[in-house]
Amino acid sequence: MAKEFSRTRRIAQQLQQELAVVLQRDMKDPRIGFVTVNDVDVSRDLSYAKVFVTFFEEDKELVQEKLNALITAAPYIRTLVAGRMKLRVMPEIRFVYDSSLVEGMRMSNLVSQVINSDKAKQQQFGSAEDVTSNDIDEADDTEGKA
């Protein structure tokens, strides 16, 4: 029977939890601020861990500054996490900004704008409920004759 969870996935989940705790409680660097650890991908040989993070900042310069602070502090963070996890080899941590949350919010705003635009047009030209199936049939008949 195949394993339900691979070892790398279990380690990635534990690493994600431990990183979240360390970044929240143990990091005193004011440049970093509030960080959310979205996901962790661990290489098969457990030598590297790609950590996907997001910040509450939308300004690209501030995001890059915070990411650089995390990258600079990565060896220290690795040491803190290694003390909390029982691994023979602690993966080298590489922080990556995860823009999927920001992109998701942007897409959601675009969809909301389109829906509001459609509602405004519907109110301006009359609701779709005013159009009956007879009107649609008549429109189809006139198109066929032309």
From Swiss-Prot:
Disulfides per UniProt: none
Ranges for region Disordered: 122-146
PROSITE patterns attached to this UniProt entry: RBFA
Compositionally biased region (Acidic residues): 135-146
Record-level GO cellular component terms: cytosol
Entry similarity comment: Belongs to the RbfA family.
HAMAP family: RbfA (MF_00003)
Subunit structure of this chain's protein: Monomer. Binds 30S ribosomal subunits, but not 50S ribosomal subunits or 70S ribosomes.
Protein name: Ribosome-binding factor A
Taxonomic lineage of the native organism: Bacteria, Pseudomonadati, Pseudomonadota, Gammaproteobacteria, Alteromonadales
